[in-house]
Amino acid sequence: MYASVIIYTLVALCGVMSSPVQEAEVAPRAIEPRMPTFADIPFPRFPSHNNHHHNEKDKGKDKGNGKGVDKNNGGGCDTGTNTQLNACSAGSPYCCSSDGNGGHICSNTTACDQKVICCNNNNGFQICIGEIDFNVPVTINIIYD
């Protein structure tokens, strides 16, 4: 008799546990458009760090590397172009820089003065990103023709 009570109890518990329960509906306000919050506000740019730690007394001196005096750059840093390797998985790289009016100027070369390389992936889309300052809002527009 005790065995049958235990078996019937287990069967009843299994039936209760396996019966489906209707989920709560999502409140309509949870999926409606919302106003911008505090986290959506673009804040001003933070000052950049000086990673080279140049002394003011060394600024503009010839360092003996054959590059001469560089008064605009501290400590004799190399001011040459930024020659990029082909980081694209397909297609050819090209250099893009901002024109200051919200647009971009692109050139079909790998010798860049800027550090962002875009890839022409034969009518596909691939983005190769170099050094981007994420202290400012970054917008990537992809226009489908």
Curated annotation (Swiss-Prot):
Gene deletion effect: Does not affect mycoparasitic activity but alters wettability and severely impairs root attachment and colonization.
List of glycosylated residues: 108
RNA-binding as UniProt keyword: no
Entry's induction text: Expression is detected in planta up to 5 days after root inoculation. Constitutively expressed at low levels in mycelia in young cultures but gene expression is not detected in sporulating hyphae or in non-germinating spores. Carbon limitation stimulates expression whereas nitrogen or phosphate starvation down-regulate expression.
Keyword Chloroplast: no
Disulfide-bonded cysteines: 88-118, 95-112, 96-106, 119-128
Cleaved signal peptide residues: 1-18
Sorted UniProt keywords: Cell wall, Disulfide bond, Glycoprotein, Secreted, Signal
Compartment(s) of residence: Secreted; Secreted, Cell wall
Transmembrane segments: none
Record's function text: Aerial growth, conidiation, and dispersal of filamentous fungi in the environment rely upon a capability of their secreting small amphipathic proteins called hydrophobins (HPBs) with low sequence identity. Class I can self-assemble into an outermost layer of rodlet bundles on aerial cell surfaces, conferring cellular hydrophobicity that supports fungal growth, development and dispersal; whereas Class II form highly ordered films at water-air interfaces through intermolecular interactions but contribute nothing to the rodlet structure.
Assembly information from the UniProt record: Self-assembles to form functional amyloid fibrils called rodlets. Self-assembly into fibrillar rodlets occurs spontaneously at hydrophobic:hydrophilic interfaces and the rodlets further associate laterally to form amphipathic monolayers.
Protein family per UniProt: Belongs to the fungal hydrophobin family.
Name assigned to this protein: Class I hydrophobin 1
Lineage: Eukaryota, Fungi, Dikarya, Ascomycota, Pezizomycotina
